[in-house]
Amino acid sequence: MTRLSSAFSKPHAALVTFITAGDGDTAANLDALVAGGADVIELGMPFTDPMADGPAIQEANIRSLGAGTTTADIFAIAAAFRARHPDTPLVLMGYANPMTIRGGEWFASECNKAGVDGVICVDIPPEEDAELGPVLRAAGIDLIRLATPTTDKARLPAVLDGASGFLYYVSVAGITGLQQAAQTSIDEAVARLKSYTDLPVAVGFGVRTPEQAANIAQVADGVVVGSALVELVARHGSNAAGALQNYVASLKHAIVAARKA
């Protein structure tokens, strides 16, 4: 069993948390997410044109790049995290340019050496992932795909072809962090996706409160929280770890209680 499959095999939905590499004290913040109860960590790779992200994550990208964060730094952060947390899955999330600028094989090799479990590439459609998909799979790294409210039954087979780890359902059309979908539409979407795949389905975009997380946890296999965490880093700077741990713990408590109810 892989680290990711183990995270999604618990009696409650997995709590998937996101922060941007190089924004604030990343090592301390990652440790805080784990201490708070995160089941999966998504580590954002900063990019100059994060078109799928809302203001909070865009600003985190600017802060990180302004601090001089490089791809080599991100892999060093990942490797150090793996040494400290051998059992917590780590997923790199970002855009094609930083992942492919030195070639897909190099990127997959670095992921493997750093102990990365999965990759989410926001801006490569399934038909165009020939540079990344095969080399990631060959390295044993999950390629996690995105589905949206506009992903219909004609499109879904292409999205699922070669996907592994989990399916990330983007619950609203648009950029991260600005709104949340109605719970009814999430329920319907998760049921529809699960009729097409055995992959765990995690729901994200716009999740902010323990109540929202609990509602999603009753139907989905995972709950993804990102912008709210990034905003805490922006607010607290290099001293964000305590706030992150407390907030994640409140989300985890709600998720566990929801699945047991």
Model regions and ranges:
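Short beta-strand/loop segments at the ligand-binding rim of alpha/beta enzyme cores
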Residues: 10-16, 85-95, 136-147, 194-205, ...
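N-terminal amphipathic alpha-helix/helix-capping segment at the start of soluble metabolic enzymes
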Residues: 1-18, 77-83, 256-261
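Conserved, mostly hydrophobic/aromatic
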Residues: 17, 33, 41-44, 111, ...
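Alpha/beta catalytic cores of nucleotide-metabolism and tRNA/nucleoside-modifying enzymes
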Residues: 191-199, 208-261
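Glycine-rich beta-to-alpha transition loops that act as phosphate-gripper elements at the mouths
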Residues: 20-24, 93-101, 125-126, 147-151, ...
